Amino acid sequence: MRRPALLASLLALLIAACGPIGLQAHTISLAYKSGDTYRYALHVALKYTVGAQGLSVPINLDMSGKETVKVQSVDSTGTADLSINLTDLSVKTTVNGTTNTTTTTTTTTVEVKVGRDGRIVSVNGSAFGSSGSLPGMVGADGGLVSAILPDKPVKPGDTWTKSYDQTNPMHSTGAYHVTTDNKYLRDEKVGSVNTAVVESKINADLDLTFDLASLNGQGGSSLLPTSGGSAALKGMSMKGTTKSDVTTWIDLGARRIVKSHSTGTIDAMIDLNMAAGATTPGLSGPITFKGTQTLDMNPV
């Protein structure tokens, strides 16, 4: 009769000494390898509203396609140069009630630098191709998003914070100031892959200036007017905030992104920089820019 009680006491002591069984801390930061290739199905949905002089213009975009991510190189800090090719894009845009749908088999290529903690260091190009030229959430224009990962081993339930500045995003002069609250939610299997599920709540203050060359360099059908006084447009400035909730599944073995889901909002004010004495019909500033965005990367 005493033996079961003794065994139970010993087990209780072991648990108290060793902590919860199975909740071992491990490293979940990214560890890409040069030459690796990963494929995803990409879906992006934007719902923006642009307001000026009492007018409100809804702008919606829904895009889906295939995404191939190739690791070009990895430096000594773990920052990876990724080449992202997007194909079979289907894009539906609705501006003020008028809908346009396009499909293409041509390839859009975006170059992205991503740190080992998942932060997007830089983006050259746009996943949205010719579908628009105003910025959205932090890093999302590259077609790849990640939760912000810890620098040290962690276990499910652990939390951490990070803040950083991302300078000159989207061919602009200026910066995002980013603060993040992050949590290792759980371990979960995605198909046959063991993953760590990490959630990041990301807030960013943005203060950006675009000159005309950088606006044209983004390509696409600008949301700014293309006739009349717009010929005198020299650039624009944007100030505001973005908020994102990003959940990412990290391969515990290969330490790469298995899939990612992001939702977010933007609330910004835009001022147009016109040549002296010139005006832009229908869009004299300031202009409000608000909306929501979702992005999903799923393995294929």
Task: Annotate each predicted stretch with a short phrase.
Residues 20-300:
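Signature of exported/secreted
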